[in-house]
Amino acid sequence: MVYNNSLLVRVMDIIILYLIALITSVIVALVLKLPIIPKEKPIRFSFETSIIFPTPILALGIEAIFRNLFGDYISLAFFAGLFGALLSKYADKLFGEP
């Protein structure tokens, strides 16, 4: 079987962009002093934001939107991680508490 080499390169580029967005969001969330895990018990019913959830999920979603709208750029992956962390930190102020 012959695999298309450009497809493999494309997939690796997307994985690298996702990793950049993920790592950036975790680092920015640590700088913003978000808790690593929610402090409310039980954790599965908690609406408290943390580094584990929803910060990386928001960053990956924003990265996917940026990639489809503007193309594959490392700087956009960095900004997606930054926006994901900021959105998870200030979501209660933007949208109100649940």
UniProtKB/Swiss-Prot annotation:
One of its GO terms (cellular component) is plasma membrane. It is found in: Cell membrane. Keywords: Cell membrane, Membrane, Transmembrane, Transmembrane helix. Pfam families: NiFe_hyd_3_EhaA. It is a multi-pass membrane protein. Its main location: membrane. The chain crosses the membrane at residues 11-31, 46-66, 68-88. One of the integral membrane subunits of multisubunit membrane-bound [NiFe]-hydrogenase eha. Eha is predicted to form large electron transfer complex and might catalyze energy-driven reduction of low-potential redox carriers. Putative multisubunit membrane-bound [NiFe]-hydrogenase eha is composed of at least 20 subunits. Belongs to the EhaA family. This is Probable [NiFe]-hydrogenase-type-3 Eha complex membrane subunit A. It comes from Methanocaldococcus jannaschii (strain ATCC 43067 / DSM 2661 / JAL-1 / JCM 10045 / NBRC 100440) (Methanococcus jannaschii). The gene is ehaA.
